[in-house]
Design a protein with these regions (language model features):
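Conserved beta-strand scaffold positions in the cores of enzyme catalytic domains, especially
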Residues: 60-62, 103, 151
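Basic/polar, cationic surfaces and motifs that engage anionic cell-wall
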Residues: 1-8, 23, 101, 109-182
Length: 182
């Protein structure tokens, strides 16, 4: 049994992933909102319940409203987190490469079904620290994503079905934090 890559994270694994990323390395961090759910454990258990279904889903990390972390898949594997790339996506996404093979995904518990709520301070602090650690561990650029990698929201690859994912997120604060915390 594996353990969490992030020391503070509760490990609630599932089998919804691509083992060893089919040889690819993570180049992007994708920020998501849960669009409902009340806790990270509830989200992790939902993902686990989809293991043998028609639409298995997962993520690497889930950040609760109070900043507690849950990890569902190893960073060395590609989580079933992003679906496909839709029309209108940012130019660097390849329609021929599954984005899950090159991304690390972080879900943020959001109570609203439309992801319209802001993230509270404890969740924001945990998110910023986790993004920093992921950038350090995987040499991901600490900036907005482009063809070489970086950080963006789910909307970047699927503006049709995920146009409001993650919803409000303190992007400018994140990049300021990442570029002062080296």
């Amino acid at each position: 049994m594996e353990e969490s890559n992030e020391p503070e994270a509760l490990w609630i694994p599932n089998n919804n992933y691509f083992p060893n990323r089919n040889g690819y390395k993570p180049r992007y961090i994708i920020i998501h909102g849960t669009a409902g759910f009340t806790s990270a454990v509830e989200v992790a258990n939902f993902f686990k319940s989809t293991e043998k279904g028609d639409n298995p889903v997962s993520t690497h990390y889930i950040i609760d409203l109070d900043g507690k972390l849950v990890q569902c898949n190893s960073e060395s594997d590609g989580a079933y987190a992003n679906g496909g790339v839709s029309e209108g996506h940012d130019a660097w996404w390849s329609k021929s490469l599954n984005p899950n093979l090159v991304t690390l995904s972080i879900e943020h518990v959001k109570l609203s079904r439309d992801n319209s709520d802001d993230i509270p301070d404890m969740q924001k602090e945990a998110s910023f620290l986790l993004v920093k650690h992921l950038c350090e561990r995987h040499n991901i650029p600490r900036r907005w994503a482009n063809a070489e990698g970086g950080i963006t929201g789910h909307y970047s690859m699927d503006p049709i079905h995920r146009s409001f994912c993650p919803g409000p997120y303190p992007w400018e604060e994140l990049f300021a934090y990442l570029n002062t915390e080296k």
